[in-house]
Regions:
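Residues in well-ordered beta-strands of folded domains
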Residues: 16-18, 41, 91
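Non-catalytic surface loops within mature trypsin-like serine protease
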Residues: 11, 21, 44-46, 82-84, ...
């Protein structure tokens, strides 16, 4: 689905850059010139945390773009949009655990 580059910014904080086409495909959205040209990802400690945060976002009225599910790379993630339509990924990545 495209090459992704990870940068360690500080302990517990990473920057991931990948093509817009890959992001749109992963989130299940059409590729358009919108605020979804990027996403903010919040990495959590386990799948239960992903589900809890996604439920919290939904209860607050956030549109759930992609419900949490297992990923092709071995993690677990879902997407929602905030009131400004920014795309948020809530993700458990076992490779990022300390």
């Amino acid at each position: 689905q495209g090459t992704v580059a990870f940068f360690d910014l500080q302990p517990g904080l990473k920057l991931a850059l990948w093509p817009r086409q890959s992001l749109a495909a992963d989130a299940g959205l059409p590729l358009t010139a919108t605020a979804t040209a990027m996403s903010l990802a919040h990495n959590v400690l386990n799948e239960t945390d992903v589900d809890a945060i996604m439920q919290q976002a939904s209860m607050a009225g956030a549109p759930i773009v992609k419900s949490p599910r297992k990923t092709f790379w071995g993690g677990y993630a879902g997407y929602f949009q905030d009131p400004d339509s920014h795309l948020w990924e809530i993700v458990w990545n076992p490779d990022f655990l300390p």
